[in-house]
Amino acid sequence: MRAAVYQGNQQFAIKDLADPAPAPGQVVVDVEFCAICGTDVHAIMYDIAPVGSVLGHEYSGVISRVGPGVERWKVGDRVIGGGGEPPPTLASARGPRFNYRNEGFPTERIRAYAEKVLMEEWEPIAIPEGVSSAEAAMCEPC
């Protein structure tokens, strides 16, 4: 798959990366639309995103693969990335801001400035009927 990989100094390069493969409890989403979030703009403007990172967390797409044990989703489901309620055992689920994550811009996590995104089963949110994929990408779930 292709991805816009941050090179530092406010520069991106389009690179070929391996397609993600879902492990148990994971899904792969084919990205249809990705908004440019203010967080991403600031990460680039102030050069705080690590070299090698793939940004983009406000997006919509279609589930293209499901890992073993996934029950909530099937191939073809339309979703937005992030914002789903985490399981109570996850540290970020404990407290009133359950959607707040402490991961920053990890280089090992490929986000939606790529053609495909790997997600935990609990992360996506279904796109309601009548909402376009372009509109859904703008909802900012997280």
Where are these regions (language model features)?
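Short Gly/Pro-enriched turn/cap motifs at secondary-structure boundaries
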Residues: 7, 18-19, 50-57, 105-109, ...
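Short polar catalytic/cofactor-binding loops
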Residues: 8-11, 34-36
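Short beta-strand or tight-loop elements
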Residues: 10-15, 59
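Residues that act as N-cap/strand-start positions at coil-to-secondary-structure junctions
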Residues: 13-14, 47, 111
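Glycine-rich beta-strand-centered segment in the early N-terminal region that forms part
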Residues: 18-34, 45-89, 123, 128-131
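Cytochrome P450 core scaffold surrounding the K-helix E-X-X-R motif
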Residues: 39-44
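NAD(P)H dinucleotide-binding glycine-rich loop of Rossmann-like/cofactor-binding domains
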Residues: 85-142
